[in-house]
């Protein structure tokens, strides 16, 4: 059993049901939430047959906290006293049980895939157009509107594609992922239903409060106002594009919890050198300044390096050489190569494809054996000419892989998602053979535990950790993104960079190129990211020679045995 920290013990012993936990990356938030729940149950604050509701955003987070809870609770207590659900799962449960309250059929189709994305593909919308349509639907459906009001709001936008997709949804008698929280909120506006769930759940725990949309906060408050523990970190709020409103959400939570706040400041994940880079960005992110819980345990105090290159080829080669050196000394280590966007990372991707090193691209799904077998066979039978000429590529791929003949729900869902992924890549111009070559077999644990190089973006890396992180593309227009023009956008861009840095345990390298090729092959001069100024003059920031010397002097006998 892990010995709780002082802050974790305080959380366990806090009797009040309303609490705000500010827990930056690597400070033990998940363990603290498990201890919080165990303390509430042991003190009898969740009398049988009432339960604790624990909400998360993703299945991965749900499974992670479930595993932690099982360490602290007897099996019977966990089974009978705890409900762990992601927000869409909770919303689906509420809809199935009470759809009649808002005049809907509880047997409507519940989403198990990105149906709106599939509709955009079927209509052959461009990627930008599909993005705009999905944004229109999301924005409208994050308001407490019934179906008639949604139709009126969409009509007011004049977006014909969004209107047509909504009409198709209603005709198909289905809900989308955007609909689930909307209908759940409408149902919970009925006091009798809200009282039922408030009575069932003696208290609520919310993971990653900074990612809440106003809609999700309203939904939770119908069930647990005044008896909810919110855990998270404003410096990790990077989902504004999905409707999250971290500043507003934090203010409302503070009004609810009052002075009941516990703040973590000790990191157990990252070396002092990495934490210094995170702290440098605190004025931009609004985050808590962090210190290492055990600075002496990190060989050499960790590594933080900055480097610039004439172009992306030299940058990519430097990343490859660094990974080669690390894996030679510590073959069990994991190296995250992260960029703000996948497009900016493509130069590093190409270098690793030819490197002979073990690498994993997080943009691509890791398919189970059966799904991978079907997709490989399907793509092997499609010529580039056919793929380029097919007017409805998504429908063609579904037919070609025999999706309609697959009856197992799990296999069908996995195959449907794989078909959508392949369709997107083919529409981007990749050949069927190139898409086929990107198929990898395994499961989610492959990405979470496999040694080697991991290629990902800042958003997909949130919640993960690597022994080393190399950030490429630290240029204006990339980080911060050139589209970051609205109020608050720059703060969120700084938080994206901070999240990327804080994935690292032993060391982080932040790289930029002076010239970057566009997708069309045109070369553009690039200025360094404005955020790099925060790191200048720091004793912890090493240049290329300083980084080389640190690697040469490092105690790899200690580093090699201290992996994630």
Segments (PLM) and residue ranges:
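C-terminal accessory regions
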Residues: 426-450, 475-564
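Accessory N-terminal region flanking or inserted into the helicase ATPase core
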Residues: 1-22, 31-32, 51-53, 123-205, ...
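Conserved RecA-like helicase ATPase core segment
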Residues: 218-300, 532
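A short beta-strand element within the Helicase C-terminal
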Residues: 454-482, 508
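Walker A/P-loop NTP-binding motif
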Residues: 31-46, 224
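Conserved helicase/translocase motor-coupling segment
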Residues: 315-424, 439-442
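Conserved P-loop NTPase-based nucleic-acid remodeling module centered on helicase motor cores
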Residues: 49-139
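Helicase P-loop NTPase motor core
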Residues: 258-260, 267-359
């Amino acid at each position: 059993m892990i010995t709780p920290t002082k802050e974790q013990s305080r959380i366990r012993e806090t009797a009040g049901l309303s609490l705000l936990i500010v827990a930056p990356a690597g400070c033990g938030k998940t363990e603290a939430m498990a201890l919080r729940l165990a303390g509430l149950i042991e003190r009898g604050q969740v009398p049988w047959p009432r339960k604790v509701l624990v909400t998360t955003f993703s299945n991965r987070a749900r499974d992670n906290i479930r595993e932690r809870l099982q360490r602290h609770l007897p099996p019977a207590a966990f089974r009978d006293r705890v409900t762990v659900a992601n927000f869409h799962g909770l919303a689906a449960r509420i809809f199935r049980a009470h759809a009649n309250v808002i005049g809907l059929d509880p047997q409507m189709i519940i989403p198990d895939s990105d149906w709106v994305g599939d509709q955009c593909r079927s209509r052959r919308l461009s990627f930008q157009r599909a993005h705009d349509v999905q944004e229109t639907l999301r924005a409208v459906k994050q308001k407490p509107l019934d179906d008639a009001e949604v139709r009126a709001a969409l009509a007011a936008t004049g977006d014909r594609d969004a209107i047509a997709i909504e009409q198709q949804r209603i005709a198909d008698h289905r809900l989308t992922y955007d609909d689930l929280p909307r209908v759940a909120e409408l149902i919970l506006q009925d006091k009798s239903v809200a009282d039922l769930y408030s009575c069932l759940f003696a208290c609520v725990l919310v993971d990653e409060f900074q990612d809440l949309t106003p809609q999700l906060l309203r939904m939770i408050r119908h069930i647990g106002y005044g008896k909810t523990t919110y855990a998270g970190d404003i410096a990790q709020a990077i989902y504004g594009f999905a409707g999250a409103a971290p500043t507003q959400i934090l203010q409302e939570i503070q009004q609810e919890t009052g002075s009941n706040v516990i703040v973590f400041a000790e990191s157990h994940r990252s070396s002092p050198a990495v934490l210094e880079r995170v702290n440098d960005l605190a004025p931009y992110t609004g985050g808590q300044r962090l210190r290492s819980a055990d600075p002496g345990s990190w060989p050499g105090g960790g590594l933080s390096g900055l480097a610039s290159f004439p172009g992306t080829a030299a940058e990519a080669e430097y990343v490859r050489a660094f990974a080669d050196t690390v894996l030679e000394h510590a073959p069990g280590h994991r190296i995250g190569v992260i960029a703000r966007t996948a497009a900016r990372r493509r130069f590093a991707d190409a270098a690793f494809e030819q490197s002979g090193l073990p690498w994993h691209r997080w943009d691509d799904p890791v398919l189970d054996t059966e799904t991978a077998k079907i997709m490989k066979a399907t793509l092997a039978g499609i010529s580039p000419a056919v793929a380029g000429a097919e007017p409805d590529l998504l429908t063609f791929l579904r037919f070609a892989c025999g999706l309609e003949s697959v009856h197992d729900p799990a296999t069908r869902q996995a195959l449907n998602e794989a078909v959508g992924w392949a369709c997107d890549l083919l529409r981007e111009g990749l050949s069927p053979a190139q898409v086929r070559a990107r198929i990898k077999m395994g499961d989610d644990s492959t990405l979470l535990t496999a040694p080697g190089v991991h290629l990902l973006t800042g958003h997909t890396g949130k919640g993960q950790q690597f022994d080393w992180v190399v950030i490429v593309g630290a240029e204006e227009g990339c980080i911060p993104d050139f589209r970051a023009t609205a109020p608050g956008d720059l703060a969120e861009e700084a938080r994206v960079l901070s999240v990327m840095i804080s994935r690292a345990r032993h060391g982080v390298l932040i790289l930029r190129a002076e010239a970057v090729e566009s997708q069309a092959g045109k070369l553009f001069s690039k200025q360094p990211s404005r955020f790099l100024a925060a790191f200048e003059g720091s004793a912890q920031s090493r240049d290329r020679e300083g980084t080389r010397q640190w690697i040469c002097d490092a105690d790899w006998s200690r580093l090699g045995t201290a992996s994630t």
